[in-house]
Swiss-Prot record:
Pfam families: Ribosomal_S19. HAMAP family: Ribosomal_uS19. PANTHER family: RIBOSOMAL PROTEIN S19P FAMILY MEMBER (PTHR11880), SMALL RIBOSOMAL SUBUNIT PROTEIN US19M (PTHR11880:SF8). GO terms for biological process: ribosomal small subunit assembly; translation. Protein S19 forms a complex with S13 that binds strongly to the 16S ribosomal RNA. This is Small ribosomal subunit protein uS19. InterPro entries: Ribosomal_uS19, Ribosomal_uS19_bac-type, Ribosomal_uS19_CS, Ribosomal_uS19_SF. The keyword RNA-binding applies. The keyword Nucleotidyltransferase does not apply. Belongs to the universal ribosomal protein uS19 family. GO terms for molecular function: rRNA binding; structural constituent of ribosome. One of its GO terms (cellular component) is cytoplasm.
Length: 95
């Protein structure tokens, strides 16, 4: 269910303060955050935000196409390595 337009996008205050401070200083350092739920807003364009995935911070460079999406969408939490190989298919067949 989408968020109501009258409420506007949700961005954690501490994250928005860090982005605004870097915009004022014209600084482009990496911003670490655990806020995967924050929506990407136009003020974040050009910044690299390191989003926590539960184990480490994944750097995400924000561009125009990402506006309106959540930060967590660009930092996967699960790694799929494929299903296990069938032990019988490799060598001998059953008789």
């Amino acid at each position: 269910m989408p968020r109501s337009l009258k409420k506007g996008p949700f961005v954690d205050d501490h994250l928005l303060k860090k982005v605004d401070a870097q915009n004022e200083r014209k600084d482009k350092r990496v911003i670490k955050t655990w806020s995967r739920r924050s929506t990407i807003v136009p003020e974040m364009i050009g910044h690299t935000i390191a989003v926590h995935n539960g184990k480490q911070h994944v750097p995400v460079f924000v561009n125009e196409q990402m506006i309106g999406h959540k930060l967590g969408e660009f930092s996967p939490t699960r790694s799929y390595r494929g299903h296990g190989a069938d032990k019988n298919a490799k060598g001998s067949k059953k008789k």
